[in-house]
């Protein structure tokens, strides 16, 4: 009980600006209600006779009947027919809708998108948070590294075939220009259509704005400088989003301080972007209750408290608790998650919301 009291006292002091450590920079944000959402497919646990009705007891907004696509929040995975290179075996891939944005058919995509939306969530009066989760490629050409590098290579090959006598720099520059022009078109028009057909909902793309902190090439809390500059140039996207949805999943391999730094940097960047926009979209951080690199292990009570605390003191408007279908695909997993909710996650959530609000 003493630990809970101390945690609440410290949190309230930070929220009210009475105390802030040397590494803390309180973000200037208008006073808002702090909300926590449940975005976990726990409906899958119903088949085992386990229900998560207690979620709302902890001041967590929970879809009616535990629906995954519900009245409070709905996430749409890879909706429509975005251009993509879908991986097959032996390094091969299947080309979907042109493979890359500059080769794609936007009309077909938008038609498939609205069909998908109407099928998965037909209620056009939806007034919750609508999340578009598209992670095949990023609209900034440079940011397509790792598994996404295939999109850069594919784009470069297209230009090289057209202009075999151009030098490497000219080819890459043209590939980048074409890719980014049409990537913007696909992402922007998709968002506009979602807003047009579900006008009461708050829409945003999962993960944006990106920060790329605590990564191999930028192993510090602050966001990559180039990424910040690129975020500044993405007002075309953020001006259309009602909510910003940075991802703050933490890894077990990081030290406790590094985990805090990861959350701090990403929330601060999203708040910075929000503060630059006239409509000041709310910032809801996507948060996972397990470690990203050790998905069978729940976050410790300390990590839950500290990550929630960082989201609050750096100006976030709330948290979206996310979970994978693989987290709840057996009786034992459902039982463990429910116990974790009742004993660790839930009590911390209610303490944080009451302290802030």
Swiss-Prot record:
Annotated compartments: Secreted
GO BP, sorted A to Z: carbohydrate metabolic process; defense response; hyaluronan catabolic process
Record-annotated active site: 135
UniProt-recorded Gene Ontology molecular function terms: hyalurononglucosaminidase activity
Source organism, top-level taxon: Eukaryota
Disulfide bond entries: 45-334, 211-223
Glycosylation sites: 105, 125, 153, 351
GO cellular component, one term: extracellular region
EC number(s) reported in the record: 3.2.1.35
Record keywords, A-Z: Allergen, Disulfide bond, Glycoprotein, Glycosidase, Hydrolase, Secreted, Signal
Pfam families: Glyco_hydro_56 (PF01630)
Signal peptide boundaries: 1-26
Catalytic activity: Random hydrolysis of (1->4)-linkages between N-acetyl-beta-D-glucosamine and D-glucuronate residues in hyaluronate
Function, in words: Hydrolyzes high molecular weight hyaluronic acid to produce small oligosaccharides.
PANTHER family: HYALURONIDASE (PTHR11769:SF35)
Family: Belongs to the glycosyl hydrolase 56 family.
Name of the protein in question: Hyaluronidase
Organism expressing this protein natively: Vespa magnifica (Hornet)
């Amino acid at each position: 009980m003493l630990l809970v009291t101390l945690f609440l006292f410290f949190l309230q002091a930070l929220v009210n600006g009475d105390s802030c450590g040397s590494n803390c920079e309180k973000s200037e944000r208008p006073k808002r209600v702090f909300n926590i959402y449940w975005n976990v497919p726990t409906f899958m646990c119903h088949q085992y006779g386990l229900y998560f009705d207690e979620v709302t007891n902890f001041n967590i907004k929970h879809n009616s009947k535990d629906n995954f696509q519900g009245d409070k929040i709905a996430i749409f995975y890879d909706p429509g027919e975005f251009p993509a290179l879908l991986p097959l075996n032996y390094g091969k891939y299947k080309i979907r809708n042109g493979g890359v944005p500059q080769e794609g058919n936007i009309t077909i995509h938008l038609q498939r998108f609205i069909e998908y939306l109407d099928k998965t969530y037909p209620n056009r009066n939806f007034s919750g948070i609508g999340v578009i989760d598209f992670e095949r490629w990023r609209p900034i050409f440079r940011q397509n590294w790792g598994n996404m590098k295939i999109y850069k290579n594919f784009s470069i090959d297209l230009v090289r075939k057209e202009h075999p006598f151009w030098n490497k720099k000219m080819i890459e520059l043209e590939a980048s220009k074409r890719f980014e022009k049409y990537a913007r078109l696909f992402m922007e028009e998709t968002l506009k259509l979602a807003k047009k057909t579900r006008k009461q909902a708050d829409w945003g793309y999962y993960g944006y704005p990106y920060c790329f902190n605590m990564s191999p090439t930028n192993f510090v809390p602050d966001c990559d400088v180039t990424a910040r500059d690129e975020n500044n140039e993405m007002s075309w996207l953020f001006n259309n989003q009602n909510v910003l949805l940075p991802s703050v999943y933490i890894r077990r391999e990081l030290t406790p301080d590094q985990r805090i730094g990861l959350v701090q940097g990403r929330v601060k960047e999203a708040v910075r972007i929000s503060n630059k926009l006239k409509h000041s979209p709310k910032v809801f951080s996507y948060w996972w209750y397990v470690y990203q690199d050790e998905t069978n292990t729940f976050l410790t009570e300390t990590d839950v408290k500290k990550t929630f605390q960082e989201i609050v003191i750096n100006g976030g408007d709330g948290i979206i608790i996310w979970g994978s279908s693989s987290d709840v695909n057996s009786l034992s997993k459902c039982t463990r998650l429910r116990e974790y909710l009742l004993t660790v996650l839930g009590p911390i959530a209610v303490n944080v919301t009451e302290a802030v609000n």
